[in-house]
Structure formats: C-alpha cells, structure tokens
Amino acid sequence: MSERRRPRWLAPATLLTGVVAFIWLMTEENSLWSVLSLGGAGAALGALHAQHAYALWSRFRRGLRAALIGGFIGGGTILAAVGLMFLKTATHAHLVGDYTLEQMLGMAARLPVWAAAGILLGTAISLFESR
C-alpha cells in the first residue's frame, strides 16, 4: 500500500493557525469560545499531520484508527486550550489574569469527556464511511 501524500494546504493552514494564535495572545480578549476554537484547530491540524505519518497508523484497522484520531482531537483540544490560557495569562502583566486558575483547572477537568466525545465521533464517522 502506498503512502498518502500530505495535502498542499496542510502546511499553510498550520502556519496560519500559528499566526492567528500569536495575534490572539496579544489581544485583550478572554472568552472561552476563542480559546477552544484555537485549541480545536491546533488539535485537528496536529491529528492531520499525525495521520500522514503512515508508519504510525498503518498497523491499526480503519475503525480503530478513526477512534484514536477522534480521541486525539477531543483531548488535544482541551490540552491546547489550557496551554493557550496559561500562555495568555503569563504573557499579560495584569494584576488580575485573563484566565483564573479555577477556569484552567475546570477546563482540564473536562479532558476525559472531550476525549470520549472525540472517540465516539471518530467511530461514528468511520461507520458512515464504511458504507
């Protein structure tokens, strides 16, 4: 079986997401929607990069591979969001941070739920594709 090539848009999309994240770090904006969107974009792009590392995924069946990638995206979204929340709070020298420790820990506590949701969504997509 031949190795699938990376799409041409993957590297520019990754670069654009990084630029948007750095611009977001400089702004005075602290909504959870934006940090989850950036975290989700980063996790999805990371999963796409990992999916094209063919030797890593070739030994898994298609359904298991989709579930693992879904779990990676779900859990990675929360991990990336918490990391971005920490970076934004650490880089801004405010008396009161953009995100509190309670918000960051609350977000991290949702990691198993988001990973499970990603696994279920990945499995569902795999079932629809197999028809």
Regions found by a protein language model. Give the residues of each.
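Juxtamembrane/disordered regions of integral membrane proteins
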Residues: 1-131
